[in-house]
Amino acid sequence: EDHCWFGHTQIRPNDPDTILFCHEGPYDLIDARLWLIKSDGSRYRCCRKQPSDLILTHEFWLPDGSKFAYVYRETTGDKIENIRLMDPETLKEEILMPCSPFAHFICDKKNEYMVGDSQGSDVPIHLLTEEMLKEKANTISNDFIYLIDVKKRTEKKLCYHGTSWLA
């Protein structure tokens, strides 16, 4: 009954009664993005709190449904960015590896590889000033697609996609 913007709804593999979804919106205006609920409406629960200087984005289930993955990005302090995994039963969080500033990412059906598209800026679009937009329009940024080897915990650039939310 809350007046929230829900998104990224996903049914858990091997457990179709568990649904992962997010409270969508600018990261600094929501207090928790990651949520779980059972298909009958029970076990509605927040997976983790989200302070206003933390971005959590593009959550997805691992193919076996044992965990879900997401990007974790601090916007202040050390500005840590990494891929994290969470157990949907215990809500225990695990750091998989550091990563580039992905806007989106997903894994293959064996969870051997992931691909991510970088967004070219570590400043979220709703916080870009007019001056920053003009400056970015004339530069080649970190707009790459990356391949991640999950076992080796490494990433490499595959190609430059050159697209942007800005234009």
Where are these regions (language model features)?
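Short, conserved, GDST-rich strand-edge loop motifs in beta-rich repeat architectures
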Residues: 21-31, 73-77, 116-140
